[in-house]
Amino acid sequence: MTQRQVEVDGQTFTLDPQGIRTSLTDGPPMLWGFQVRVLDGERELGIKTCFVGRVSVQFRDASAPDGPIDVLLPVLHELAFEKIEARLREGEPGDEILFA
């Protein structure tokens, strides 16, 4: 899993994604969930619990939802990071649930 550094108003945050879980279904997965730790250096400021839906993933990359994890993972992370960065710009580094 790839960390990302984000700069907001002169402050650098590190986004540290954790393991992914998929929705339990007999059909194709419709939802993926994972946590992203928001760090200021080594200090944890919050945990963003992110849920990303199949439609969002398909819109970004049509092959990703049913593709191998190395294709799916970057799309999931990118969608979550975009939401988290927007929340950081609004001054919200703490714990919360986000949907993408």
Roles of regions detected by a PLM:
Residues 6, 38, 50:
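Short aromatic-centered micro-motifs
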Residues 11, 41-44:
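Short acidic/polar mixed-charge low-complexity motifs
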Residues 19, 38-40, 57, 65:
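A generic structural signal for solvent-exposed, polar alpha-helical segments
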